[in-house]
Amino acid sequence: MTFGLIPIALAAQSFQLSRNEGEVKVTGTSTLHDWEEVAEQRNGSMAIDQSGELPSISSLSFTIEAESLKSGHDGMDKNTYKALNTNKYKEIVFKMGEVKSISPVVSTTNKYKVVASGNLTIAGKTNKVDLPFTLTVNDGKAILEGTKPLKMTDFGIEPPKALLGTIKTGDDIEVHYNTIWK
Protein backbone atom coordinates (compact mmCIF):
# COMPACT_ATOMS: atom_id res chain seq x y z
CA MET A 1 0.00 0.00 0.00
CA THR A 2 2.79 2.44 0.74
CA PHE A 3 4.08 2.20 -2.81
CA GLY A 4 0.67 3.23 -4.16
CA LEU A 5 0.75 6.43 -2.12
CA ILE A 6 4.20 7.59 -3.12
CA PRO A 7 3.43 8.52 -6.77
CA ILE A 8 0.36 10.47 -5.69
CA ALA A 9 2.37 12.47 -3.17
CA LEU A 10 5.07 13.16 -5.74
CA ALA A 11 2.58 14.21 -8.43
CA ALA A 12 1.87 17.58 -6.76
CA GLN A 13 4.46 20.22 -7.55
CA SER A 14 5.14 23.00 -5.06
CA PHE A 15 5.53 26.58 -6.26
CA GLN A 16 6.71 29.65 -4.38
CA LEU A 17 5.61 33.16 -5.28
CA SER A 18 8.43 35.03 -7.00
CA ARG A 19 9.08 38.27 -5.14
CA ASN A 20 10.99 39.86 -8.02
CA GLU A 21 8.63 39.10 -10.91
CA GLY A 22 5.01 39.96 -11.51
CA GLU A 23 2.90 42.49 -9.65
CA VAL A 24 0.07 42.82 -7.16
CA LYS A 25 -1.60 46.22 -7.03
CA VAL A 26 -4.72 47.79 -5.58
CA THR A 27 -6.61 50.45 -7.54
CA GLY A 28 -9.44 52.74 -6.59
CA THR A 29 -10.99 56.16 -7.01
CA SER A 30 -11.33 59.33 -4.99
CA THR A 31 -13.05 62.67 -5.39
CA LEU A 32 -9.69 64.04 -6.63
CA HIS A 33 -8.19 61.30 -8.83
CA ASP A 34 -7.85 57.57 -9.42
CA TRP A 35 -5.08 55.92 -7.43
CA GLU A 36 -3.03 52.74 -7.23
CA GLU A 37 -0.76 51.10 -4.70
CA VAL A 38 1.72 48.33 -5.47
CA ALA A 39 2.51 45.55 -2.99
CA GLU A 40 6.30 45.54 -2.71
CA GLN A 41 6.59 42.65 -0.22
CA ARG A 42 4.63 39.49 -0.82
CA ASN A 43 5.09 35.76 -0.48
CA GLY A 44 3.06 32.66 -1.07
CA SER A 45 2.94 29.00 -1.92
CA MET A 46 0.86 26.84 -4.21
CA ALA A 47 0.71 23.08 -4.90
CA ILE A 48 -0.50 21.82 -8.27
CA ASP A 49 -1.00 18.23 -9.39
CA GLN A 50 -0.78 18.01 -13.19
CA SER A 51 -1.20 14.24 -13.50
CA GLY A 52 -4.87 14.42 -14.53
CA GLU A 53 -6.66 15.85 -17.55
CA LEU A 54 -7.00 19.16 -15.69
CA PRO A 55 -4.53 20.43 -13.08
CA SER A 56 -5.62 20.14 -9.47
CA ILE A 57 -4.67 22.94 -7.08
CA SER A 58 -4.41 21.39 -3.62
CA SER A 59 -3.22 24.52 -1.83
CA LEU A 60 -2.82 28.23 -2.49
CA SER A 61 -1.95 30.94 -0.01
CA PHE A 62 -0.32 34.33 -0.19
CA THR A 63 0.55 37.14 2.16
CA ILE A 64 1.14 40.83 1.53
CA GLU A 65 3.00 42.95 4.05
CA ALA A 66 0.39 45.69 4.62
CA GLU A 67 2.94 48.50 4.94
CA SER A 68 4.57 47.44 1.68
CA LEU A 69 1.61 48.91 -0.23
CA LYS A 70 3.15 51.96 -1.91
CA SER A 71 1.50 54.66 -3.99
CA GLY A 72 4.52 56.90 -4.51
CA HIS A 73 2.93 59.50 -2.20
CA ASP A 74 3.85 59.36 1.50
CA GLY A 75 0.65 61.08 2.63
CA MET A 76 -1.54 58.59 0.81
CA ASP A 77 0.50 55.67 2.12
CA LYS A 78 0.08 56.92 5.71
CA ASN A 79 -3.69 57.23 5.21
CA THR A 80 -3.77 53.67 3.84
CA TYR A 81 -1.82 52.29 6.80
CA LYS A 82 -4.10 54.11 9.23
CA ALA A 83 -7.21 52.73 7.50
CA LEU A 84 -5.73 49.21 7.52
CA ASN A 85 -4.69 49.64 11.18
CA THR A 86 -1.22 48.33 10.35
CA ASN A 87 0.00 48.98 13.89
CA LYS A 88 -2.14 45.98 14.86
CA TYR A 89 -2.63 44.06 11.59
CA LYS A 90 0.65 43.64 9.72
CA GLU A 91 -0.46 41.36 6.89
CA ILE A 92 -3.14 40.83 4.26
CA VAL A 93 -3.64 37.07 3.82
CA PHE A 94 -5.50 34.80 1.38
CA LYS A 95 -5.78 31.08 2.09
CA MET A 96 -7.63 28.88 -0.37
CA GLY A 97 -10.22 26.45 0.90
CA GLU A 98 -11.31 24.86 -2.38
CA VAL A 99 -11.28 25.22 -6.15
CA LYS A 100 -14.86 25.91 -7.26
CA SER A 101 -14.17 25.57 -10.98
CA ILE A 102 -11.36 25.00 -13.44
CA SER A 103 -11.66 24.87 -17.22
CA PRO A 104 -9.17 25.02 -20.09
CA VAL A 105 -8.85 28.16 -22.18
CA VAL A 106 -9.71 26.78 -25.63
CA SER A 107 -7.15 28.61 -27.76
CA THR A 108 -4.16 27.93 -25.50
CA THR A 109 -2.47 24.87 -24.06
CA ASN A 110 -1.64 24.75 -20.35
CA LYS A 111 -3.87 27.76 -19.62
CA TYR A 112 -6.94 27.48 -17.40
CA LYS A 113 -9.72 29.66 -16.00
CA VAL A 114 -10.00 29.05 -12.26
CA VAL A 115 -12.24 30.21 -9.44
CA ALA A 116 -10.80 29.47 -6.01
CA SER A 117 -12.74 30.05 -2.82
CA GLY A 118 -10.97 30.92 0.40
CA ASN A 119 -10.54 33.25 3.33
CA LEU A 120 -9.22 36.77 2.77
CA THR A 121 -8.11 38.64 5.87
CA ILE A 122 -7.66 42.41 5.69
CA ALA A 123 -7.28 44.68 8.75
CA GLY A 124 -8.09 41.76 11.04
CA LYS A 125 -11.41 40.89 9.39
CA THR A 126 -11.77 37.62 7.50
CA ASN A 127 -14.30 37.14 4.69
CA LYS A 128 -14.86 34.18 2.41
CA VAL A 129 -14.23 35.29 -1.18
CA ASP A 130 -14.15 33.76 -4.64
CA LEU A 131 -10.86 34.56 -6.35
CA PRO A 132 -11.03 34.33 -10.17
CA PHE A 133 -7.81 33.92 -12.12
CA THR A 134 -6.17 32.52 -15.20
CA LEU A 135 -3.52 29.91 -14.47
CA THR A 136 -0.78 29.05 -16.96
CA VAL A 137 1.59 26.20 -16.12
CA ASN A 138 4.74 25.62 -18.22
CA ASP A 139 8.28 24.40 -17.62
CA GLY A 140 8.20 24.44 -13.82
CA LYS A 141 6.64 27.88 -13.68
CA ALA A 142 3.06 28.98 -13.00
CA ILE A 143 1.52 32.34 -13.86
CA LEU A 144 -1.57 33.41 -11.95
CA GLU A 145 -3.34 36.54 -13.16
CA GLY A 146 -6.68 38.19 -12.57
CA THR A 147 -8.66 40.97 -10.92
CA LYS A 148 -10.83 40.86 -7.80
CA PRO A 149 -13.26 43.70 -6.97
CA LEU A 150 -13.74 44.34 -3.24
CA LYS A 151 -15.40 46.87 -0.97
CA MET A 152 -13.35 48.35 1.87
CA THR A 153 -16.38 48.45 4.16
CA ASP A 154 -16.84 44.66 3.78
CA PHE A 155 -13.62 44.39 5.81
CA GLY A 156 -14.58 47.03 8.37
CA ILE A 157 -12.36 49.64 6.72
CA GLU A 158 -13.62 53.19 6.50
CA PRO A 159 -12.48 54.59 3.14
CA PRO A 160 -9.69 57.10 3.87
CA LYS A 161 -10.30 60.85 3.74
CA ALA A 162 -7.84 63.72 3.43
CA LEU A 163 -7.83 67.50 3.83
CA LEU A 164 -10.53 67.56 6.52
CA GLY A 165 -12.75 65.20 4.55
CA THR A 166 -12.76 67.21 1.32
CA ILE A 167 -10.99 64.38 -0.53
CA LYS A 168 -12.77 61.05 -0.11
CA THR A 169 -11.69 57.63 -1.31
CA GLY A 170 -14.35 55.45 -2.92
CA ASP A 171 -15.43 52.24 -1.16
CA ASP A 172 -14.88 50.08 -4.28
CA ILE A 173 -11.37 48.84 -4.97
CA GLU A 174 -9.85 46.27 -7.29
CA VAL A 175 -6.93 43.97 -6.60
CA HIS A 176 -4.98 43.19 -9.78
CA TYR A 177 -2.58 40.27 -9.70
CA ASN A 178 -0.12 39.09 -12.30
CA THR A 179 2.11 36.77 -10.33
CA ILE A 180 4.88 34.33 -11.19
CA TRP A 181 5.33 31.14 -9.15
CA LYS A 182 8.44 28.90 -9.41
Question: Across the structure, where does each feature detected by a protein language model lie?
Answer:
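Low-complexity, acidic/polar, glycine-enriched regions of mature
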Residues: 12-182
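Bacterial Sec-dependent N-terminal signal peptides
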Residues: 1-16
